[in-house]
Amino acid sequence: AVTKADVEQYDLANGKTVYDANCASCHAAGIMGAPKTGTARKWNSRLPQGLATMIEKSVAGYEGEYRGSKTFMPAKGGNPDLTDKQVGDAVAYMVNEVL
């Protein structure tokens, strides 16, 4: 499971900036199965895999199924200019919103 100590290793202020510019378009509304930011029940099934795995999937991209619906996240949220650190900060920011 993910703890506050896990997310506090990341730059959460930078994560919010990256989120606002790149991630909110899907995660604010829950588009394509994206877990809605700030909605704990949408994140609870993902948290047990750990923050590092969640970041890896966000960097590499992810295709799967959630409650019978297909989900898809392009690598780095579709912005190849983002660094792995920026993606990590953004994921940590989103997770922090539900801890």
UniProtKB/Swiss-Prot annotation:
Keywords assigned by UniProt, alphabetized: Electron transport, Heme, Iron, Metal-binding, Photosynthesis, Transport
Any GO molecular function: iron ion binding
UniProt PTM comment: Binds 1 heme c group covalently per subunit.
InterPro entries, sorted: Cyt_c-like_dom, Cyt_c-like_dom_sf, Cyt_CIE
Chain ranges passing through the membrane: none
Family matches, as Pfam families: Cytochrom_C (PF00034)
Superkingdom field: Bacteria
Family annotation (PROSITE patterns): CYTC
Binding site residues for heme c: 23, 26-27, 73
Keyword Iron: yes
Keyword Iron: yes
UniProt-listed GO biological process terms: photosynthesis
Name this polypeptide is given: Cytochrome c-555
Species this chain originates from: Prosthecochloris aestuarii
